[in-house]
Amino acid sequence: MILAAALAICAASCSEWTDPDPKFHDPVNINSEAYYQALREYKKTDHAICFGWFSGWTGTGSDLYNQLRGIPDSMDVVSIWGGKTGLSKEQKADMKEVQTKKGTKVLWCQHVVDLGRDITPAGHTALEYWGWNGSSYDGSDEADEAIRKYARAIVDTVKHYGYDGCDFDYEPNFGYRGNISGSPAAMHVFLSEIANHMGPTSGSDLILAVDGEPQTLLAETGPLLDYYIIQAYYCPGDYNLDQRFSGLLAKFGVLEDEETIMRKTVWCEDFEKYQTSGGCDFVTRDGIHTWSLMGMAMYYRPSLPGCRTGGVGAYRFNLGRSKSDYYHLRAAIQQMNPASK
């Protein structure tokens, strides 16, 4: 079954988010333009998103596993995991279809490690092309200008291919430490330049998100981001999510209130491992036993009654298509944004 626009439209405030009165009614014919118009309008509303990293993208073939058009209609944001450049005409058409027909946002995903990663032209060294390539960030004017130049090149590339923003994979303490990622100050230089063109302070509709270890960034970097995407893989319960959230609150709480941080936080599970089950065994703070993606969709803060999270997501979520036709993602969407009756 296709889950999509038959979802309750979420209002702006957290208290209104729990209003049981349906604010949206599903058009009778889900193949009609009225259906897709309603779907696009739903995705513009204030609601918890469904996010995921999409792998093996070809945009063509008999297997919709490789095509964005085969994902659940109500998925809000997709981050391309690998193969994000040199797009074929089939990939371009596939991306444009889900963007224009379904209102799905498609993001450029990239590890942030060293200056020039994925962008330095062939035949050039980072030093000669960008103007700096120290082993670690030194705070010099040369370093800052090189990092900003690199950031602008990424922005230009993202816009060239028609992506809806960036998802930067930032994991300096998990094997991806470089002359940018190894320094929160360098990351701030990098992301503040990106934020001139995308994210909540840019005035654009392009998304700027950081996944992995956003809590390692400087506090002043937080307001530049739309989402804190947390790889809460193999999460056994709310107590674990509480610990992770406490790290975000400790870092960004000096500039953002708890509600803002909550509404930006997207919990993610690993579907490379849990594509058939939706996650590991999970226990909520209310004693409910479920699978972890569903537990993440049910997450709430006692200190913020009625306030939604940013949403949930999954790594390599499209592996679940052949196993269950995205059952676990669809169920999580329904939990966060119940369909009108």
Regions flagged by a language model, labelled:
Residues 1-4:
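Sec-dependent signal peptide recognition
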Residues 9-13:
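C-terminal motif of bacterial Sec signal peptides marking the signal peptidase cleavage site
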Residues 14-341:
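Secreted glycan hydrolases and related glycan-binding modules that recognize and/or cleave
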